[in-house]
């Protein structure tokens, strides 16, 4: 196995589970610091220990000579036959995923040209509907600060001096906002082990 082929395949494997911009910014140490909200990757690694060494192998063993075949092996395993589907009118990523017992995230991993579940499909395109079976576990740890809304409650007051079908808004409700600082781990594109809440601060009170 050529080391350049291996390095390229590992790179393609990684980009199946993380946006290229996020990966590049982490590797180049050019992530933007969080000022109000946002996220940064704190650590990135493989669960497995990968050893590269010279040696002799049997002529009956599989030898990966190009990036594509090795990437396919790393993503789908040794015995997975690649299955394709031809996009028809009305198809969406969600509908194709559901029909083939995939979740949309697995579809996106198998078809990295599509960036989100809302990406438009072109009629006649061949898409990969093979269930992934990764041979490696790509892990990264994230610190994220985000704002979540606190919905206000509607309060109804009755006025006996008004008609029964009369209504008016006396005080407009205001949605509150809580700023949450959290840590979590992502393995092969899936958040694992729950979320650790570092802090939770109300920055805007709700008004019912």
PLM features: residue spans?
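Primarily a LysM-type cell-wall glycan-binding module
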Residues: 1-4, 70-101
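Cell-surface/extracellular proteins and modules involved
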Residues: 5-27, 92-106, 115-117
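Short, recurring structural edge motifs at helix starts
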Residues: 82-85, 94, 115, 166-172
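Extracellular LysM carbohydrate-binding repeats and other cell-envelope/extracellular binding modules
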Residues: 26-77, 103-138
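Extracytoplasmic
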Residues: 1, 35, 45-47, 51-54, ...
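Serine/threonine-rich low-complexity intrinsically disordered regions
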Residues: 142-208
């Amino acid at each position: 196995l050529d080391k350049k082929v291996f390095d390229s395949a590992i790179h393609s494997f990684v980009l199946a589970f993380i946006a290229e911009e996020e990966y590049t910014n982490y590797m180049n140490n050019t992530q933007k610091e969080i000022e109000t909200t946002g996220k940064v990757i704190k650590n990135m690694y493989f669960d497995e220990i990968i050893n590269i060494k010279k040696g002799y192998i049997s002529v009956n063993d599989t030898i990966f000579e190009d990036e594509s075949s090795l990437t396919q092996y790393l993503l789908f395993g040794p015995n997975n036959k690649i299955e394709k589907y031809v996009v028809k009118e009305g198809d969406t990523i969600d509908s194709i995923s559901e029909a083939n017992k995939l979740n949309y995230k697995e579809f996106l991993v198998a078809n990295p040209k599509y960036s989100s579940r809302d990406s438009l499909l072109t009629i006649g395109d061949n898409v990969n509907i093979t269930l992934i079976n990764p041979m490696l576990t790509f892990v990264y740890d994230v610190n994220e600060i985000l704002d979540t809304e606190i919905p206000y409650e509607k309060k109804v007051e009755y006025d006996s001096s008004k008609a029964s079908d009369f209504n008016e808004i006396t005080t407009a409700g205001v949605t509150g906002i809580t700023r949450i600082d959290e840590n979590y781990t992502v393995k092969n594109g899936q958040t694992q082990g729950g979320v650790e809440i570092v802090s939770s601060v109300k920055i805007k009170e709700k008004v019912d």
